[in-house]
Amino acid sequence: QDLPHVDPATDPTAQALKYSEDAANADRAAAARPGKPPEEQFCHNCQFVLADSGEWRPCSLFPGKAVHETGWCASWTLKAG
């Protein structure tokens, strides 16, 4: 089942967390999170993403919606393991 994609233009949570579908366009350096260098932080290696594969994946920060695998937000946290 395809979940609706998080829309950073209209989603208040996405705006608060500075979510971007393309991490290259996000200000990762200014909001640097521990675990990996900012340029290696993506939704696909974040603990909040709930799938191990797929271009669009469910995220626990956006219930019922999907984030892009190469996206990023200010809550990025390195996936354990």
Curated annotation (Swiss-Prot):
Organism (species): Halochromatium salexigens
One family name in Pfam for this protein: HIPIP
InterPro entries xrefs: High_potential_FeS_prot, HIPIP_sf
Family, as annotated: Belongs to the high-potential iron-sulfur protein (HiPIP) family.
Record keywords, A-Z: 4Fe-4S, Electron transport, Iron, Iron-sulfur, Metal-binding, Periplasm, Transport
Entry superkingdom: Bacteria
Binding residues for [4Fe-4S] cluster: 43, 46, 59, 73
Described function: Specific class of high-redox-potential 4Fe-4S ferredoxins. Functions in anaerobic electron transport in most purple and in some other photosynthetic bacteria and in at least one genus (Paracoccus) of halophilic, denitrifying bacteria.
Subunit architecture: Homodimer.
Gene Ontology terms, MF aspect: 4 iron, 4 sulfur cluster binding; electron transfer activity; metal ion binding
Record-level GO BP terms: aerobic electron transport chain
Top-level taxonomy: Bacteria, Pseudomonadati, Pseudomonadota, Gammaproteobacteria, Chromatiales
GO cellular component, one term: periplasmic space
UniProt subcellular location: Periplasm
Stated name of the protein: High-potential iron-sulfur protein
